[in-house]
Amino acid sequence: MKETPLSNCERRFLLRAIEEKKRLDGRQTYDYRNIRISFGTDYGCCIVELGKTRVLGQVSCELVSPKLNRATEGILFFNLELSQMAAPAFEPGRQSDLLVKLNRLMERCLRNSKCIDTESLCVVAGEKVWQIRVDLHLLNHDGNIIDAASIAAIVALCHFRRPDVSVQGDEVTLYTPEERDPVPLSIHHMPICVSFAFFQQGTYLLVDPNEREERVMDGLLVIAMNKHREICTIQSSGGIMLLKDQVLRCSKIAGVKVAEITELILKALENDQKVRKEGGKFGFAESIANQRITAFKMEKAPIDTSDVEEKAEEIIAEAEPPSEVVSTPVLWTPGTAQIGEGVENSWGDLEDSEKEDDEGGGDQAIILDGIKMDTGVEVSDIGSQGGPKHWKNGADAPIILSDSEEEEMIILEPDKNPKKIRTQTTSAKQEKAPSKKPVKRRKKKRAAN
Amino acid sequence: MAEPASVAAESLAGSRARAARTVLGQVVLPGEELLLPEQEDAEGPGGAVERPLSLNARACSRVRVVCGPGLRRCGDRLLVTKCGRLRHKEPGSGSGGGVYWVDSQQKRYVPVKGDHVIGIVTAKSGDIFKVDVGGSEPASLSYLSFEGATKRNRPNVQVGDLIYGQFVVANKDMEPEMVCIDSCGRANGMGVIGQDGLLFKVTLGLIRKLLAPDCEIIQEVGKLYPLEIVFGMNGRIWVKAKTIQQTLILANILEACEHMTSDQRKQIFSRLAES
């Protein structure tokens, strides 16, 4: 299936929200989503949930002959797959670009950082070594696959136990799990990827972008670090220009985040170890709550609702009187009525005239200025609140429009669309004769001022 | 008399069809067969019941029952094709046995004729727009299907805009077609949806619940602050409020409404109202 396109209004909304430091799910700029790690019954199998993004990791091992140029080292093999259930856009042949990028990043993060001691995987030099294979499957895509995948890989590797092997002279004995307890892998450190999404050419940054944020981001910076603050891999994609201090700041943030995540991982591993030792039940089936419907459960989103009413009051105070949700139609002229606020006025600077207007319809004030030319006569005729007052109060009154080309047009803000004025002029042509007089009157007033 | 007999017969026979009336409000699974009311009497114990022949034409009175979503006609019975609860609506007036349907829950939308949906314009090719509605194919929308549109006066629609329209053609054999005018030629609220605001996706069941005539959620939300909402039957909701904060709160409330009981919801609304 084709990916659902991102509509213009979503993109605009997300960028505006990011400019106001607001995220869709109420997180702060540097917050991660909830990470949940659960283990399966076999050693080396785990599921990591980063918010709604889910990755399944499975580690397996096999005795093979080593590579020719590395006779004493074991072999590591990483594979990340984007399952079709993760997103409708993932099809068997389709997601090649993203897949290649993710796989390369995983390899660089785990293999090149030498987090696993490959020398310890050697059984008989030149003949038999262990091949460790890490398979990662993306089960659900809600943004930030890289972080979830790297956590799943390292957790699975730490959790895995390989069969014990003993070498006596020429004899190699491979023990089954029943004969001897399986042995954990020798892991030096735990590299974890932290993603930073950049918006508006590097002005705003977010940690752990979710799927919507990833769609509108300009670029992505991934830093793989371990808890000793050693950078294992760093990658910047999207072609954005980053300043040196931005990168340094990101690495500091990454250091903090990696420390937290590593703590979480160690705690999860410890818990699982304890449960297995005590003989309790473990595995995926146990991590699912029994006798409870969890399909209809949703985590609470920490949306800030504290100052909703304040902001609303500010808006209302500025546009007095407070507007009703359902407004009655305002009759401008026989045949033309208006309900609601209408689109935003683009004629001139209205805030000054609004503030000075102490009475009079708040919403209507905006529209009055907008169609003042058309309804110049009618305003004074109807005697609607504050109509003629505008002209007296507004020291910098908005554009005075004349419908006669002979009179000189005084444009207060020449950079605002001159085109608009033209179209308004043509529409006001019918009222040419009667409205001429009031225009002249007004102009005289201004001259006096 | 017929029901206990048929139930007993069912336990004997194993996979006997159940009477639709007895299963109302219960969960039914795909593959089940349901008997309509007048057939229950016919299917008595054993099947062969002797009835006095009557010369009156009234004897074979057939009631016209409408088969709604999730049900299919299979001979004289109803075959369930979706799992969910069985519902029934009495006919308002006149004859007819009412409507039977299955209340199921899903996220993937299948275009249905007459549904009002929110679509995203993906392409403009010649005279038609391709609009993504969440189905298997993009729907086609002609530029003349807007109010006041003529060959010279084209609507101002860009790629990436949101459109609220209804389907005129939607079956499994053809690509769906939608329009933004009703049969009188008026827009009636349809057309391009404004520039700001937030679009998000929910399940189809939640949309149906929110669009029910007596939905409390919308009334309560409306009391909080002024807002604009558009519901699309394809699971998409567009909201707009005065500030971004309010829009985000709205979006999260509506998404969470699905998982909240009405008590929890009232709690949250009262907390919002007083804060």
Swiss-Prot record, chain B:
- Residues modified as N-acetylalanine are 2
One GO cellular component assignment for this chain's record is: nuclear exosome (RNase complex)
What InterPro entries does the record point to?
Exosome_RNA_bind1/RRP40/RRP4, KH_dom_type_1, KH_dom_type_1_sf, NA-bd_OB-fold, RRP40_KH-I, RRP40_N, Rrp40_S1
The GO terms describing molecular function are: 3'-5'-RNA exonuclease activity; RNA binding
| UniProt keyword terms in alphabetical order | Acetylation, Cytoplasm, Disease variant, Exosome, Isopeptide bond, Neurodegeneration, Nucleus, RNA-binding, rRNA processing, Ubl conjugation
Q: Where are the residues linked by the Glycyl lysine isopeptide (Lys-Gly) (interchain with G-Cter in SUMO2) cross-link? A: 151
Q: Where in the cell is it found?
A: Cytoplasm; Nucleus, Nucleolus; Nucleus
Superkingdom of the source species: Eukaryota
Give the GO biological process terms.
CUT catabolic process; DNA deamination; exonucleolytic trimming to generate mature 3'-end of 5.8S rRNA from tricistronic rRNA transcript (SSU-rRNA, 5.8S rRNA, LSU-rRNA); isotype switching; mRNA catabolic process; nuclear polyadenylation-dependent rRNA catabolic process; nuclear-transcribed mRNA catabolic process; poly(A)-dependent snoRNA 3'-end processing
One Pfam family from the record: KH_6
Assembly and binders: Component of the RNA exosome core complex (Exo-9), composed of EXOSC1, EXOSC2, EXOSC3, EXOSC4, EXOSC5, EXOSC6, EXOSC7, EXOSC8 and EXOSC9; within the complex interacts with EXOSC5 and EXOSC9. The catalytically inactive RNA exosome core complex (Exo-9) associates with the catalytic subunit EXOSC10/RRP6. Exo-9 may associate with DIS3 to form the nucleolar exosome complex, or DIS3L to form the cytoplasmic exosome complex. Exo-9 is formed by a hexameric base ring consisting of the heterodimers EXOSC4-EXOSC9, EXOSC5-EXOSC8 and EXOSC6-EXOSC7, and a cap ring consisting of EXOSC1, EXOSC2 and EXOSC3.
Function field? Non-catalytic component of the RNA exosome complex which has 3'->5' exoribonuclease activity and participates in a multitude of cellular RNA processing and degradation events. In the nucleus, the RNA exosome complex is involved in proper maturation of stable RNA species such as rRNA, snRNA and snoRNA, in the elimination of RNA processing by-products and non-coding 'pervasive' transcripts, such as antisense RNA species and promoter-upstream transcripts (PROMPTs), and of mRNAs with processing defects, thereby limiting or excluding their export to the cytoplasm.
Name the PANTHER family on file. Answer: EXOSOME COMPLEX COMPONENT RRP40 (PTHR21321:SF1), PNAS-3 RELATED (PTHR21321)
* Disorder named in the UniProt entry: Pontocerebellar hypoplasia 1B: A severe autosomal recessive neurologic disorder characterized by a combination of cerebellar and spinal motor neuron degeneration beginning at birth. There is diffuse muscle weakness, progressive microcephaly, global developmental delay, and brainstem involvement.
Which family does the UniProt entry place this protein in?
Answer: Belongs to the RRP40 family.
| Protein name (record) | Exosome complex component RRP40
